Amino acid sequence: METIRPLKFGTLSLPDRESRLVCRSILLDMLGEATIAPDEGDLTGVTGLFWKYVSLSLATVYFPRTMLRVNASGMGDSGVVILRAMDSPLVIRHRRIKVEAARADVIFLPSDASSEITLPEGGRFDCAHLPAYALASKRDLLKPIMMQPLAAECLPLQLLTNYAGYLLRQEYQSEEHAGMMVAHFYDLLPVLAQDIGNVSPRETPHNRMASIKMRVEQNLANGSFSITDVAEAERITPRAIQKFFSREGTTFSRYVLGRRLSLAKSLILAEGEATSISQIAYNVGFNDLSYFNRTFRSRYGVRPSDLRRLAAAA
């Protein structure tokens, strides 16, 4: 089975010319041809991480802590680029529109036209490219949140960036596992659009199931959340909801359990020893720790504590 792993690029001793070549090659398939102009000094010592899957590309670049501009030509496809600066505000000029985002806030940007990206204080720059074909069923959904700053405090956005961070930090992933994580990444886009863009679920493709899954995602931490809660919110019967999930070869309860276990696994891998296993279990809606441990081991073939230990040793 093919193994997918992030690429660590650059070193603190890498000279300016080589740093520029590395940055160009990394950003080429995300922003198009890009020229980087620091206000002072050069790009000596740039480092970062790059991860690529067939339907998602991710990069984190650690630029010098000085004002710099990135002039990007854009891509040939009509996909979406997600941008974030962690050490600086972010200023973007795109098609005569200027957008400013605070430190750690996020901007969704069309990838098919040139842009000028300014980091007044330089530092860490995060970028994701979502190709057009992967967004086919979600393009209209994203329109209300394009080209506006999205606050870092938004919970669906935090989940989205946590998935991206996990993919960039995890040393080894099977193609199957990477595909599952990317699918979850895309599943969060309707949730984000609903939370920020105030998009009615009935305006989106596959509206009912997308709305149901959105409600599940928003209530994973609620241990008492049930199919009855969804039925009341959607104004349909629990039986109708079960029919929707039956068409996907599962049940409501199995879907919720799978999402909770998947989120728990991501948090275990991403947070290291910062949060206890029991707290993670409760945070994703499990009220019984022994049940969590049992179902987690049944699904992934390893106990949560052993997974954390293996990840730390990798």
UniProtKB/Swiss-Prot annotation:
Domain HTH araC/xylS-type, chain residue ranges per copy: 210-310
What keywords are assigned to this protein?
Activator, DNA-binding, Ion transport, Iron, Iron transport, Plasmid, Transcription, Transcription regulation, Transport
Point out the coiled-coil segments of this chain. none
Gene3D superfamilies, alphabetized: Homeodomain-like
Identify the domain of life: Bacteria
What SUPFAM superfamilies is this protein classified in? Homeodomain-like (SSF46689)
The UniProt GO MF terms for this protein read: DNA-binding transcription factor activity; sequence-specific DNA binding
Keyword Iron listed: yes
Enumerate the InterPro entries for this protein.
Homeodomain-like_sf (IPR009057), HTH_AraC (IPR018060), Tscrpt_reg_AraC-type_HTH (IPR020449)
Write down the PROSITE patterns for this protein, in alphabetical order. HTH_ARAC_FAMILY_2 (PS01124)
Q: Which residues bind DNA?
A: 228-249, 277-300
Give an example GO biological process.
Answer: iron ion transport
Q: What does this protein do?
A: Transcriptional activator of the rhizobactin regulon.
Protein name per its UniProtKB record: Transcriptional activator RhrA
Q: Which organism is it from?
A: Rhizobium meliloti (strain 1021)
Q: What gene name is given for the protein in this entry?
A: rhrA
